[in-house]
Amino acid sequence: MTQPLDGLKVIEIGGTVSVSAAGKKFADFGADVIKIEPPQISEVRKIAPFPDDIFHIDKGAVHLAFDTSKRSIVVDHLTNSGKEIIQRLGSKANLIIMDIPAKEALDLINIFKDGDSLLTNIVTITPRKV
C-alpha cells in the first residue's frame, strides 16, 4: 500500500524531541527519513523511562516512540567532513528539518546555497539568536 509521502526524502538534523517528533510524522506517512545524530548521545536517547529503570542508549521510551521508521547516521555537523556528508545527503533530499543552534544552522544552510537561492527546502524547529 502506498503512503501519502512515498518518494519524499527528508533529512533530520539534531537530537531534540521536537525534531525527532517532526521526522517521525514524515516517516509515518511514508517519507524516507535519515536522522543525523550528533556524536554525543542525543537528548532523545537520554529521556526516561527505561526498562527496569536502567539507562540504555537504544531502549528509552521516547527514543523508541520518535525514532522508528527512520534510517540513522552519526555525523558531527561542526566538522568539515561532517558538513560534506550532510551536503551529499541533503543534495538528494526534498526537505531538511533541524533543531540546532542558529549559528550552526546558518553554517549548514550556506552549504546548500547556489548563488542567492537555496537548493533544498529547510525548516528550523526552534528559532534561536545567532
Features from the language model and the residues they span:
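N-terminal helix-loop segment corresponding to the beta1-alpha1 unit
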Residues: 1-130
